[in-house]
């Protein structure tokens, strides 16, 4: 029995991302430092290994609440408060995920509907998540400005796409370019986004 015709039709819109294709192509080359997928260039630190072992020895290996371990969410809340002066309630405003892709997948699944548009400064690698939920990607070409999204380009894309835009993904440091934004650049983008009802 072939059940493939019963799969989500949006799966046909998804291709393996270019960064994954590139990573697969170079992964067999000896001595290559693979920074393609945001992998660190170091192994797990000893204190992290020891903490994981201690947690297992203490039988802390069962399911947590669906938002993640409260102590971890409290630590995350304190971290962003100290570092960025952003204040979130650990109890109901922070969700622990295993990485950025899971976090984006959960978020985009919650906010997007078929017909919605997500603006994505290119190059980037999150198109499959967006397409899976039936939304569309509109890439913003950033090559002219060393892969930095400018407020002018963002404003132009928001106006061109109109009310269809549901979200803008700002991923930095960005794979595959390594670009990062200054505080001033982010404030300029925030100034544009404040005028629109987008995530």
Name the predicted role of every residue range.
Residues 12-99, 106:
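N-terminal small-domain helix-loop-helix segment of the aminotransferase-like
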């Amino acid at each position: 029995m072939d059940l493939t015709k019963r799969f989500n039709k949006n799966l046909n819109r998804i291709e393996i991302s270019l960064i994954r294709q590139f990573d697969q192509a170079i992964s067999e080359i000896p001595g290559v430092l693979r920074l393609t997928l945001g992998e660190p260039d170091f192994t797990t630190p000893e204190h992290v290994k020891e903490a994981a072992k201690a947690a297992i020895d203490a039988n802390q290996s069962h399911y947590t609440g669906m938002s993640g371990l409260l102590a971890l969410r409290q630590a995350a809340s304190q971290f962003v408060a100290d570092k960025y002066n952003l204040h979130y309630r650990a109890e109901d405003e922070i969700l622990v995920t295993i990485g950025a892709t899971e976090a984006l997948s959960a978020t985009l699944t919650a906010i997007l509907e078929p017909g919605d548009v997500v603006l994505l400064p290119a190059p980037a690698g999150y198109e499959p998540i967006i397409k899976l939920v039936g939304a569309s990607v509109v890439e913003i070409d950033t090559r002219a400005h060393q892969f930095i999204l400018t407020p002018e380009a963002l404003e132009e894309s928001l106006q061109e796409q109109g009310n269809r835009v549901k979200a803008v993904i700002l991923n930095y440091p960005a794979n595959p370019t390594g670009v990062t934004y200054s505080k001033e650049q982010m404030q300029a983008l925030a100034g544009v986004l404040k005028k629109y009802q987008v995530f």
